[in-house]
Structures are given as C-alpha cells and as structure tokens.
Amino acid sequence: AKYMFREVLGIDFAEPFRRIPWIEAMERYGSDKPDLRFGMEFHDVTDRVKGHGFGVFDDAEYVCGFAAAGCAAYTRKQIDALTEFVKRPQVGAKGLIWIRVEADAVKSSVDKFYTPDEVRAVAEACGAAAGDMVFLLSGPKFKSLTQLCALRLEVAQQLGLRDPKTFAPLWVVDFPMFEWDDQTQRFYAMHHPFTSPKLED
C-alpha cells in the first residue's frame, strides 16, 4: 500500500499504518473503514440518558453521539435539514436529538426531560465545549452507530473537513467472521473467510 501511494501519488508514509480493531472502529466512528482525517469521535451515553422519562432513550438499546466543533451557530433550518438527512431511507434513523453548547448555557431538543446540568453532562461526555453542537441517535447498537456515521460524514462535508488531497490510511483488524442479516434471518461471512483467518474462528 505504501508503494502505491509513493509511486502513484508521490506520497511517502514514513510511519507504519495505524491499526484499529473492528469493534473500536465501529464504536468510535460507526464504520469498518473510518475517515480519520477529522475528529468527531462517538461516545456511548446510554447510561447517562436513560431513566428520565424520555421514551425514545429509555426504550433504546444504545444511545451515542458526537460533538461538532463550532456548530452551535447552526440555525434551526440547518438542524432540520440534518434531521431530514438521517430520516432518509438510505440512513433510516427515526429522528435526531441535538444539544447546543454555549459558554453560559446549554439548549437541547429534549430540555423537557432533563435539567440543564444533566444536558451539559451529556454534552461534556461527548467531548463538547462552548461553541459546539452535539448530535445524538438511539436504537439498536450497530444500526445507530452506522446511522451516526452517515451523519458524521455529512457534517464533516459541510464543514469542509473531507479534503480529497489529505490521506489518513489505516488497517482495520480483528473483524468478526460472520454478521447477522435481519432481512434474510441468517448469518453471512463479513469478509471472505479465507483471506485473513484467526485461530479462534
């Protein structure tokens, strides 16, 4: 891979490519091929948000979110557009929860169910600071992570963070051998089972 970068693009990577276990890639970025050119890592806030009477979170297996730096200035129109984005069939989320973090206040779409201190604690758990916006999705764990990944990439695109001339190569390792498909109700090999076998499989 380094040879191809060097010969085709004239880019020489001196350091070894980063390696990330599959489960870490999924939990931090929602993808088995994560874009590492920018941050916006995911955070599990399930335990922080359950038990407050908000059924969407109380009934969910998993609640996760990320902080988008500088996005507290997003207008209602921009937030609504992102909500419609995640509700598209291609993404499949039922809605989007947001937290606007300012120096002296926090505002969220679920203020009815949480105190300002509770909302701020969730925002801080997602790594947010003043001037940031936090976006949260909930549902089955890996479905929510995948949906949040689509949102992460969309927000990064809007912020100009996905520079096609910048590269952040990595190897994702330790893939599960099989994955379950809800539609066909059966297991499928996640990748060709003989390309990178593990002894425990």
Q: What positions do the PLM features span?
A:
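Class II aminoacyl-tRNA synthetase catalytic cores and aaRS-like
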Residues: 1-201
